[in-house]
Amino acid sequence: MVTGIFLPPRNSWRFLALAVVAAVLAGCTTAPYTGRQQVLMVSPEREQALGYQAFSQIERTSRQAQDPALRARVREVGERIAKAADRPDYHWEFVVFQDDKTANAFCLPGGKVGVYTGLFKYIKSDDDLATVLSHEVAHALARHAGERLSQGRLAQAGGLALNVGLAALGVPSVASQAAMQGYGLGSQVGILLPYSRVQESEADRIGLILMAKAGYDPEKALGFWERFATAKKDKAQPPQFLSTHPTDAARIQSIRAFLPEARQYYTAR
């Protein structure tokens, strides 16, 4: 009885390479609004389940804000953004977490959105709040979390194929280890980080469209990001090629370029 397939060592790396290519082709899809080609090897259902699981853990370990007016404000603006996103399959939820030292927000797969109270020192209007929420919702709408998971899987598969290929070629172990270490650094800087910057820029672009569709002025987004950049300019930033986010100057320049597109969707509420 045949229990498996034997691949000669010199051919196994070719098989792995073909398997990686096949997986990439099978997972090709297109991001909304931008039309960017993506590779997604995670199902929407699995991605959303991971998002719900992560959100439950955050709720267990974080304290929610008790200010009813603040919670209602975030929920009202968030629901307008969610309506513009047009994903009725998402279980939208907008929660404010009490942490005045954290100026951050997130949207997990499936529509679970969190905003930390520390962010409100920079938010001067509902348009500012819509800027933040629409950016985070855009990450979920474009399935950036699933894309990142897929990139990690592809990087692992590429490393395995390289390891098998080096062994098949009889490369000495010391040289093989050096090559693998170089591959790890190269995949991080050359593949994973740049994609993260692409996703951030894409979330800015889609976010402007979403806030415009929801009736918030996309022009105000520029002022918010400029103000936010000024407030944190004293904090050291890594070089852009080592950062998961674009530099503040690059982000603001991109937003200026995206605004004409977003204006086409804007009707004042």
Please place each PLM-identified region on the residue numbering.
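C-terminal motif of bacterial Sec signal peptides marking the signal peptidase cleavage site
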Residues: A23-G27
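Bacterial N-terminal signal peptides that target proteins for export
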Residues: V2-A17
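A Zn2+-metalloprotease active-site environment signal
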Residues: F15-L16, C28-R269
